[in-house]
Swiss-Prot record:
It comes from Corynebacterium glutamicum (strain ATCC 13032 / DSM 20300 / JCM 1318 / BCRC 11384 / CCUG 27702 / LMG 3730 / NBRC 12168 / NCIMB 10025 / NRRL B-2784 / 534). This is Crossover junction endodeoxyribonuclease RuvC. It comes from the Bacteria. Residues 169-221 are annotated as: Disordered. One of its GO terms (cellular component) is cytoplasm. The lineage of its organism: Bacteria, Bacillati, Actinomycetota, Actinomycetes, Mycobacteriales.
Length: 221
C-alpha cells in the first residue's frame, strides 16, 4: 500500500522535556524532516499547571503541522517511580490532545524504535542519534536527545505504516467475512425455527395445511 505523503508526528513523552517532531513519508523508505523541537515545563510548578502547558504546546503543534497520525513512545521504564508517573501523566495528555483532533495514535517501545532505525534493539542514544541524522540527511545531530528520539519515533512509524495498513486491511476483510457468516447463521436459524413452527402449527390444525400462509410466495407464468 502506498503511504507516500503520510505526515507523522513523533513524540518522546516527558513532563520536564517532551520531544516533538514532524516528518513526511516519501517514496519507499525516504522520509523528509518537517520540524523538530522540545517542550519544557518547570519542575517546580504544580502538576496540573505543567500538564496544561504541555497540552497547549502539543495542541499548537498538531494544529500547525496537521499530522495524519501520532507516534508516541510507550512508557516502559523501571526507574524512579515519580519519573514514571509523571511520564504516564504526560502520555495521557498527549493521547487526549490527539483524540480531540481525531488523530490515530500508535505506540512503540524503545526497543521497537531502536530495531527499526538502527537494526539493533539495544542501540544506545549516540548510535540512534547518528542513524537518525543520516536517515533524514540533517546538517547536524538533533539536540537534545529528546528531539532525536521524537524523530526516531516518527520515522519508525513511517517505515512500519505499510505493514500496519496491510494488517488492518486483512483484519477488516476477515471481520467482514466473520460478520457475513454470523448473519448467514442467524438467517438459517431463523428459517429453521420458522419452518418448525409452521410444521407444528399445521400438525395441530389440519385446516391450515390446506390454506398456505399469506407469506408464502407462488410464482406463476
Amino acid at each position: 500500500m502506498n503511504h507516500e505523503g503520510l505526515r507523522v508526528m513523533g513524540i518522546d513523552p516527558g513532563l520536564t522535556r517532551c520531544g516533538l517532531s514532524v516528518v513526511q513519508a516519501g517514496r519507499g523508505r525516504t522520509v523528509y524532516p518537517v520540524s523538530v523541537g522540545v517542550v519544557r515545563t518547570p519542575p517546580d510548578a504544580e502538576l496540573a499547571e505543567r500538564l496544561l502547558r504541555l497540552s497547549k504546546a502539543v495542541g499548537e503543534w498538531m494544529d500547525e503541522y496537521t499530522p495524519d497520525v501520532i507516534a508516541i513512545e510507550r512508557v516502559f521504564e523501571r526507574g524512579n517511580v515519580s519519573t514514571v508517573m509523571n511520564t504516564a501523566h504526560a502520555v495521557g495528555v498527549l493521547i487526549l490532545a490527539a483524540a480531540e483532533r481525531g488523530l490515530p495514535v500508535h505506540m512503540y517501545t524503545p526497543s521497537e524504535v531502536k530495531k527499526a532505525i538502527s537494526g539493533n534493539g539495544r542501540a544506545d542514544k549516540k548510535q540512534m542519534t547518528v542513524m537518525i541524522t543520516r536517515i533524514l540527511g540533517l546538517g547536524e545531530p538533533p539536540k537534545p536527545a529528546d528531539a532525536a528520539d521524537a524523530l526516531s519515533l516518527a520515522v519508525c512509524h513511517c517505515w512500519r505504516a505499510p505493514m500496519l495498513m496491510r494488517a488492518q486491511s486483512q483484519y477488516s476483510e476477515q471481520e467482514l467475512e466473520k460478520r457475513r457468516r454470523v448473519q448467514q447463521g442467524k438467517l438459517g436459524k431463523a428459517k429453521s425455527t420458522y419452518n418448525a413452527e409452521q410444521a407444528q402449527s399445521h400438525a395441530s390444525d389440519p385446516a391450515k395445511a390446506a390454506h398456505p400462509s399469506q407469506f408464502q410466495r407462488t410464482d406463476t407464468n
